């Protein structure tokens, strides 16, 4: 437990507290009055209101669209089901910058819909909501569908035999069993959309600003640290509350249900109604998920005079006008891969130790630490990144000019995925096997190597894959700490989109396509090696 606690204390809590302190202290004295001053400003109230409203709207829309998909994946067996499950999960591991870029290519000026029907939705709230549904569709499908597939359908059939109608049986038997999973999925979707940054920044334009975008604007553009500090505290409180409720729903789901093998519940769709439902879900996946990704690829190949790889070839040289890149954009790929590999190793060590500690200990303190491990997914990455710059600049942690700063920030986001993936698998390992190895003379290290490691190896690979994918796409903190001569892929895409010109736009599409393909390949590989009990993600 000591290593994970120290890691989070130094590289998460310390930078965040330092930023808040820098903003709310004057001459060493806390200025609590600044909180009321900031929260009473009409512009800040507008940001808070829009952040909450769009998160609630995104959550409701995601549930409405994704719950039929959860049922189809849980109860139907059809050709290509595993591949389709991997496809719908791809958006979840995509960087938000790529998601924003894909929807910009679909809905923006000169985009697919603009050319097809003269319709533009960029800089509208609909673009933000649709992108959020695209991003979080898999959260509902996997969380709710994963539980739904393990519910014994004979219980609902028994209710119908006793006289209940189809809907009444579902409402009285299945819905109460699913409610904790639906609540957990809704809370996670709310968390991800409440803290949305890249999607809103790219698609929302100046008219729309969430808390995360406003923290970035107040910090990086206006240098108004008091306002940024107050907004960080508000976001921290909201995220903490959401995670506390989420932890309660997960415990309730684990404790209250008797589950069966998913292979026993999936059947071929029968009748016109079930086939229509399957067709509707397939159409939703095609339009909502595959179309934006396909348009992104097409726009990366759409060069003057036809289609070709001109934008990809242009990535090999630095910007001739000077100002966007000090190096060729293509080098961002190599930088990102290096950073992500180091971040993955860090996340595996810290997250693996944390999961092992949580498995072998119990109590309210341990449950609290489990919830704290999820905070980096919700607390402002912008705050963490800026906090790195102002705290890790003195011995013995003078890291501001070193390359390790980026992997450390990325690992913070990877650790929760490692913990959530490893924890159920480690809890399923029979401790008596380890005890027997110890009795036979094996040291604790050898017992772990000979007993635990073979049982959790596949889950460890899945955790590594998730950590690699999310590290590769981390943007909020990296945009602050990545050096101009060592940009990552998401930072390079954002810089290109920030400049006018057909070449810059095309290069942004090309880089986004490369990043999408790397993340998709990682996800498809994970689906092939994924064990049945490899966690919530």
Regions found by a protein language model. Name each.
Residues 80-81, 145-172, 199, 229-269, ...:
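C-terminal transmembrane helix and the adjacent membrane-cytosol boundary/short C-terminal tail
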Residues 280-360, 365-372:
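Phosphate-binding active sites in nucleotide-utilizing proteins
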Residues 32, 37-43, 194-240, 270-274, ...:
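Interhelical loop and adjacent transmembrane-helix boundary motif
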Residues 32-37, 45, 80-81, 100-133, ...:
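Membrane-interfacial helix termini and adjacent extracytoplasmic/periplasmic loops
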Residues 1-18, 82-88, 236, 240-244, ...:
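N-terminal signal-anchor/first transmembrane alpha helix
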Residues 1-5, 15, 42-54, 112-139, ...:
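Loop-to-helix entry region at the N-terminal start of transmembrane alpha-helices
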Residues 34, 56-88, 101, 155, ...:
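Transmembrane-helix boundary motif in ABC transporter permease subunits
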Residues 2-7, 60, 90, 94, ...:
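Transmembrane alpha-helices
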């Amino acid at each position: 437990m000591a290593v994970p606690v120290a890691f989070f204390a130094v590289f998460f809590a310390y930078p965040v507290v330092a930023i808040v302190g820098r903003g709310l202290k004057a001459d060493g004295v806390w200025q609590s009055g600044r909180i009321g001053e900031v929260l009473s400003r009409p512009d800040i109230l507008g940001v808070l209101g829009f952040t909450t409203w769009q998160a609630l709207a995104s959550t409701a829309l995601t549930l409405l669209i994704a719950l039929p998909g959860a049922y189809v994946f849980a109860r139907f067996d059809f050709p290509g089901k595993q591949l389709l499950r991997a496809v719908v999960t791809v958006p979840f591991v995509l960087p938000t910058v790529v998601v924003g870029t894909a929807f910009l290519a679909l809905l923006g000026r000169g985009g697919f819909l603009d050319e097809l029907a003269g319709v533009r939705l960029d800089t509208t709230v609909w673009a933000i909501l649709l992108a959020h549904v695209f991003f979080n569709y898999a959260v509902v499908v996997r969380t709710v569908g994963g539980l739904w597939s393990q519910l014994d359908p004979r219980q609902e059939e028994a209710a119908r035999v006793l006289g209940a109608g189809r809907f009444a049986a579902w409402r009285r038997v299945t819905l109460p069993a699913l409610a904790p999973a639906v609540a957990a999925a809704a809370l996670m979707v709310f968390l991800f959309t409440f803290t949305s940054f890249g999607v809103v920044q790219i698609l929302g334009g100046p008219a729309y600003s969430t808390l995360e975008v406003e923290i970035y604007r107040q910090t990086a553009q206006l240098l108004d640290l008091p306002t940024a500090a107050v907004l960080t505290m508000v976001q921290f409180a909201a995220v903490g509350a959401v995670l506390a409720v989420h932890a309660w729903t997960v415990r309730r789901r684990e404790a209250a249900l008797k589950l069966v093998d998913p292979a026993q519940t999936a059947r071929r769709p029968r009748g016109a109604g079930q086939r229509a439902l399957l067709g509707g879900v397939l159409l939703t996946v095609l339009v909502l998920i595959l179309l934006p990704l396909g348009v992104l690829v097409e726009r990366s190949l759409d060069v003057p005079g036809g289609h070709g790889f001109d934008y990809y070839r242009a990535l090999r040289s630095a910007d001739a006008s000077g100002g966007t890149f000090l190096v060729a954009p293509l080098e961002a790929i190599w930088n990102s891969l290096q950073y992500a590999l180091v971040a993955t190793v860090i996340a595996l060590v810290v997250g693996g130790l944390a999961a092992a500690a949580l498995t072998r200990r119990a109590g309210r303190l341990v449950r609290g630490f489990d919830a704290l491990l999820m905070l980096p997914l919700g607390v402002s990455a912008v705050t963490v990144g800026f906090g790195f710059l102002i705290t890790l600049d003195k011995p013995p942690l003078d890291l501001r000019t070193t390359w390790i700063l980026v992997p450390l920030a990325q690992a913070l986001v990877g650790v929760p995925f490692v913990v959530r993936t490893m924890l159920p698998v480690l809890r399923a390992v029979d401790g008596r096997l380890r005890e027997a190895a110890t009795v036979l003379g094996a040291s604790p290290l050898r017992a772990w190597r000979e007993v635990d490691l073979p049982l959790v190896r596949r889950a460890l690979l899945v955790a590594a894959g998730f950590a690699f994918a999310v590290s590769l796409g981390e943007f909020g903190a990296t945009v602050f700490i990545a050096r101009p001569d060592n940009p990552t892929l998401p930072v390079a895409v954002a810089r290109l989109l920030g400049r006018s010109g057909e070449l810059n736009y095309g290069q942004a599409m090309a880089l986004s396509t490369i990043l999408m393909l790397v993340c998709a390949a990682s996800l498809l590989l994970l689906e092939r090696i994924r064990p049945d009990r490899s966690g919530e993600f």
